[in-house]
């Protein structure tokens, strides 16, 4: 438990969860899966390729209302969302997670923490008292400075612990077998 919230870390496929499923996007909520803008093997790419109606997804993103302190702006001629912003789509929470420049998703460690702190507030705003499943954010192809799986997981849990966001449902962090093999979960449990 972290701040009274049941937090579980488990191996699995996030798409099989019946909870809210958090999916990271870049700051533009791009939807082009072409192995340049979005890689097919990324969680983002797999999510988009599962959809029947990408136009519906784009419409929902474009029609999402601005949120105080999370207003959209124009960057490089495109609508850009602040890191941490969540747009709800079906049973998914779509997260503006990374900057996108020169066809690369990038995030400094400082921006990673800022994004996570904003994300917990956004989850609190939209989760409607339903449990949440999240992946190991930053564990994929996003270029994060100084990343390793243990530190990413610790940072996710630390920002939850220090967040003031009222969340009253369980959170499951869904990891791949490959990722679980790289993390000493006993050390994580000792910290929290």
Pin down the residues of each PLM region:
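Macrodomain-like recognition of ADP-ribose-binding/processing modules
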Residues: 1-192
């Amino acid at each position: 438990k972290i701040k009274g919230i049941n937090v579980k870390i488990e191996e699995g496929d996030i798409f099989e969860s019946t909870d809210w499923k958090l999916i990271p996007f870049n700051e533009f909520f791009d939807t082009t899966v072409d192995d340049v803008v979005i890689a097919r093997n990324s969680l983002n790419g797999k999510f988009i390729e599962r959809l029947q109606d990408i136009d519906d997804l784009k419409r929902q993103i474009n029609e999402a209302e601005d949120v105080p302190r999370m207003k959209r702006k124009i960057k490089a001629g495109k609508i850009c969302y602040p890191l941490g912003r969540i747009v709800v789509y079906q049973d998914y929470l779509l997260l503006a997670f990374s900057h996108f420049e020169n066809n690369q998703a990038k995030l400094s460690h400082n921006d990673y923490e800022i994004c996570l702190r904003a994300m917990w507030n956004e989850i609190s705003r939209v989760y409607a008292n339903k449990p949440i499943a999240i992946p190991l954010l930053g564990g994929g192809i996003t270029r994060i400075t100084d990343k390793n799986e243990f530190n990413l997981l610790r940072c996710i849990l630390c920002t939850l612990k220090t967040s003031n966001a009222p969340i009253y449902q369980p959170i499951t962090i869904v990891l791949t077998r490959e990722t679980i093999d790289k993390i000493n979960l006993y050390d994580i449990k000792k910290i929290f």
